[in-house]
Structures are given as structure tokens and as C-alpha cells.
Amino acid sequence: MKYRERLIRRVVTISLSIVVLGGPAYTQSKSSPPDLTGTWVPFRAGRGGDPKLAPPAPTPLAIKPAYLKDYEAKRAADAAAISRGEQLANGAIACMPYGMPSMMSVASYPVEIIQTRKQITMIQEAFSEVRRVYVDKPQLAIDDVPPSYHGRSVGRWDADTLVIDTVGIKESVQYQRIPHTPQMRITERMRLVAADILHDQITIEDTVTLDKPYTYTLAYRRMPDYEMVEFVCAENNREYVDEQGIVRMRVREK
């Protein structure tokens, strides 16, 4: 608990430092790819600081009519529960992984990136989720990738931008209730926009459920001295789901 409190204080300090963030434009050496190794905390750049560091607004979400009614009903149910101070059940309550692309931004939890020439490993502190990006390997046909929480990711460098192609996400793994089929493809473009500021542009494509691709961008700031905290959800997990699908907490008996 004390370690988590220190993390929260550190995240608050980082958030406040954004106000004074700015300086000259960032330039990257053309001789080699940028080094993304480090621990990165999500934040909303540009608040009182340099607006050029703020991620662009997401594109409009265009869900096909056959899936729209169910999507809107689920989002409305989520909003209604929140207005009552409640939460509807999701996989995380049972300690299931968030999966892709949700794992790239879980509240204020950081993501650690370990970069080598052939593989880039990303570790989300929440739930200790791990994904591996295989660099300069060909992507498999979607039907040849067993469905999983994180899918299969391959990457390549386009100048200073890491382009990642991910397929094979389980249909039950959704980002903000957006429906998808096994044909979904996720494309990421990760790029340093300043020495310690990283943008991850994420595009979700599924010609079955979406009329057009949906794109949003996450922003992170590097935390040079942070040590990742062990996260074991199953240990002392006291959350459960009642008959109405509402998340409840078991109160420990004295």
C-alpha cells in the first residue's frame, strides 16, 4: 500500500510538471531508430504547457448499424451505473487481462518498454500484462493466429516511427465496448515527439463492424528512475459480481 501511495504521489508530480513542459523542437538521429526503452506514464499533454505535445483528438467512431444498437445499449448501461456510483462487471473484476489495445492505457499505471534489435517488449504494470512486438518479422494470416488477449504483433521502423501491426485479438476483448470480429487489425505508430514524450497512435480496423477505421492517440512521459511494482490481482481480490451484474466488494470480517 505504501509503495502504491508513492506511485500516486509520483504520478501527480509528473502531471504537475507538464504545466512547464516545453523547449526547443526534438530532433532524432537519422543513423539509428530512437531508443524507446524506459518506463512511461500516460498523461494528457498540452494542459498549460506546449500544445504541440498534446495528442490529436480521436477520429469519429463509425459503427455499422447492425452493431450500433447493442454498442449504445452497453455504453448507456455503463454510464447509468457510474451515475449511481456503481460499476458493471468486466473481465478485470475476475483478474482477466485488459488485452489489446486497452492495456496500453490503464488509469495512471505505467508501461515499461524494453527495446532490442529483434524484439520490443511492453509490460503494463496493471495486471502485469506483457506483449511482445517482433521486429522485421512478417505478419501471419489472421486465420493462422490463435485468438488471444494481446494477439500477435510485428513491428518495423519507418524512419523515427515504430509501426506495429497486431492481429488475432479475442472477440471478448474490447476497447470501450467497441465491437469487433476476428478480422480486426490494430495498427500503431509510436513516435517520440520530444526527448521523453511518446505518442502512440492506435488505429482499429474491422470491415465487418466499422464503417471506417477508428484512430486515437495516447501520450506518455518517460519516468527515468521508476521501478515497476509487482501486481498480483488474484491475491486478496475481494471484488465480486452480484445477480444484477454490478461489481461489489466483500468486506473483511473483523
Give the residues covered by each predicted segment:
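Low-complexity, intrinsically disordered segments with a bias for serine/threonine
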Residues: 19-21
